[in-house]
Regions:
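Outer-membrane beta-barrel proteins
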Residues: 1-374
Length: 374
């Protein structure tokens, strides 16, 4: 404990020595109550009502810059999760980088989000279970050891590209290259003017799945998000396509929140149901509307997902889903507020639960959380 305190004091010394170093972060926690129900040909399985205290992406970071002359400067950032429920976290496990910025834009290297990971503006909710927010819509973005270029602003238009190298993605294979490459390419464009913003991104994730001929193929992800945020009104929507990003079993697990047993069989297990170990292609869409009334901002989100079909077989493995989240935010100040929501999510009854049963999944959730940003 004493060593930890000393380390924090030493780490804080540069903050007093340089005005270019900024300490920032947020603390967010919520209480969630939820229940999952699996209904199939052989009857229903209903979970107990679960109540949990959650950390909701609490973080702390340091960032700064140094003017190198002219318009050129060094930029850097070190950011990490700080799980206030006591979960073990590392250092620099969020966006952390060093780079250069100038009239040409900026180039960074480190642990970086691709643009897909940044397209979550229409998801304002605090949640742990996917029923209570747009966890399905935001699932394909990631953060990797990568290099990224962001263009300057051309009258509201910007673009970016990022690359996560093979040997960072496959570190155990970096000197032999006997395994399929898993490097990732991502690119995106955005336009913003007078409160309106439109974002579009494409991700090409190598080494994601195997086709019928045994060839290893890349996951292909495309996403569009647009929103209007001005004069107290927020209206936003998005469409998301993912091919080969996950298996049917993995995709189904997003809806069960860990309650996976139906008649004693794990409905998300590849061994229990190898048919659903096939990669799937999925399309989902979402829309969020909110309006600020003084300190209160009521919101509603609706999401719909079309059936997930096998990339090789074309078979419907997970049925369509529909989701509604209703709630809002109350702000005590610019930095502190409360979020609360009620949510309902339903996966259609044509989902392959097991080899012998089809059915669907329902999930209900309620959550209330407090946040503070600094």
């Amino acid at each position: 404990m004493k060593k930890s305190i000393i380390a924090l004091v030493i780490a804080g010394l540069p903050l007093a020595a340089s005005a270019e170093v900024i300490l920032y972060g947020q603390i967010k926690s919520s209480v969630t109550v939820g229940q999952v129900k699996i209904k199939g040909d052989a009857g229903s399985e209903t979970s107990s009502t679960a109540t949990s205290i959650n950390d909701n992406t609490s973080r702390i970071g340091f960032k700064g810059s140094e003017n190198l002359g002219g318009d050129l400067k060094t930029i850097w950032q070190v950011e990490q999760k700080t799980d206030i429920t006591g979960g073990s976290q590392g250092f620099a496990n969020r966006d952390s980088f060093i780079g250069l910025q100038g009239k040409f834009g900026k180039v960074r290297a480190g642990k970086l989000s691709n643009m897909l990971n940044e397209m979550d503006t229409i998801d304002p909710w605090m949640y742990k279970t996917n029923a209570a927010g747009l966890g399905i819509f935001t699932r394909t973005g990631n953060r990797n050891a990568a290099v990224r270029y962001d263009s300057p602003d051309f009258g509201g238009f910007k673009f970016n590209v990022s690359y996560a190298p093979r040997d960072n993605r496959n570190p155990s294979d970096k000197y032999t290259h006997t395994k399929a490459a898993k490097d990732q390419y991502t690119g995106g464009v955005s336009f913003s003017k007078n409160g309106f913003t439109a974002n579009a991104a494409y991700g090409h994730y190598n080494g994601a799945y195997t086709d019928n001929s045994g060839k290893v193929k890349a996951a292909q992800i495309a996403k569009v998000e647009t929103y209007y945020d001005k004069d107290n009104l927020f209206v936003g929507g998005g469409v998301h396509y993912a091919k080969g990003h996950e298996t049917a079993n993995k995709y189904l697990s997003y809806f069960t929140d860990g309650f996976n047993k139906y008649k004693g069989i794990d409905i998300t297990d590849d061994i229990a149901d190898p048919v659903k170990s096939e990669a799937v292609k999925v399309v989902d869409a979402a829309v969020t509307v909110g309006y600020k009334l003084g300190n209160v901002t009521p919101r509603i989100t609706y999401a719909h997902g079309w059936p997930a079909k096998g990339v090789n077989s074309g078979e419907k493995l997970v049925d369509k889903f529909d989701q509604v989240v209703v709630g809002g935010q109350y702000t005590f100040s610019k930095r502190t507020g409360i979020n609360a929501q009620l949510a309902y999510l339903k996966v259609g009854n044509k989902t392959r639960l097991t080899a012998a049963n089809k059915g669907g999944v329902e999930q209900k959730a309620a959550s209330v959380g407090l946040y503070h940003k600094f």
